[in-house]
Amino acid sequence: MEKELDKDKKIAVLIDADNVSEKYIKFIIDEISNHGTPTYKRIYGDWTKPNLASWKAVLLNYSITPIQQYSYTTGKNATDAALIIDAMDILYSGRVDGFCIVSSDSDFTRLAARLREAGKYVIGMGEKKTPTPFIAACEKFKYLEVLASSTTESTEPETPETKREVGQTAGAGGAGTNVTEISEAVRTIITEISDDDGWASLGEVGSVLNKRYPDFDTRNYGFHKLTPFLSSLGCFEIRSRKTSNPNVTNKYIRNQQPKVEPEEAAAPRPRKRKPRKKKRAPSSGTPS
């Protein structure tokens, strides 16, 4: 459902060490592999600071190049400036098809917008505290906490009861847009693109939804696929239709239709009772 680059596309991964923990690196690299091939893998920070000492082993394991950037003065973020300059150099080199900016900092909002203006696919990654402007500037945004948790939970079987509970609660106060807003957005999209019978291609619905909500990811709500997530909401009908290829089926979705109750059997009309004829009293006396 989600727009993704081909696996052979080249992506520059630029990481802000000041705003990302080393525990997320594995999940970042794994997620990028779903979108393309990371050709540039750079991380920016002042590596003379003790708080970044724990990064060394991780950077070696994942072949990530650390870029040293001293803090020239207090209150100025030289790391951000170095990352932005490198991103523009890579852009003009013409060697990549997309960028992944990993940070929870809104300072990269304009950079993401500029890269998209140049026709590049931009993926943002950050923690749940990431400001909305940076999220909106990216074509897609992934929450690091969700990437980490979805990997550890992927081996656990999902029961219908679990899905329904997660679908109703996730997103509220957590990662991503509130599930109620997503549900209403899906209803609107279906109305806009459906056929005369109200059915719309599930793939098209997912594509439009991803464009309107850059941070939309079914994993935010405890699901790995769009179909079970939408089914858990209980307000949509989903059907599969066969194609000319027996191995391929297309899925369609429409807003749940009101149930038509069968008409109650008409009650038999009450029979009209004929008025009883009054008996004539016998005449007295003899006829003349």
What are these model-derived regions, one by one?
Residues 44, 97-104, 111, 115, ...:
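Acidic beta-strand-to-loop metal/phosphate-binding motif
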Residues 17, 71-72, 104, 127-128, ...:
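Short, ordered loop/turn segments at secondary-structure junctions
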Residues 74-76, 129-133, 149-151:
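Short gly/pro/ser/thr-enriched loop/turn and capping motifs at secondary-structure boundaries
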Residues 1-86, 91-92, 113, 121:
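Domain-level signal for Mg2+-assisted phosphodiester chemistry and nucleotide/NA-binding surfaces
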Residues 112-146:
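VWA/integrin I-like adhesion module and closely mimicked acidic/polar interface patches used
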Residues 13, 21-24, 28, 51, ...:
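Helical mechanochemical/support elements of P-loop NTPase systems and associated helical scaffolds
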Residues 144-156:
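Long, charge-dense, solvent-exposed interaction surfaces that engage phosphate-rich ligands
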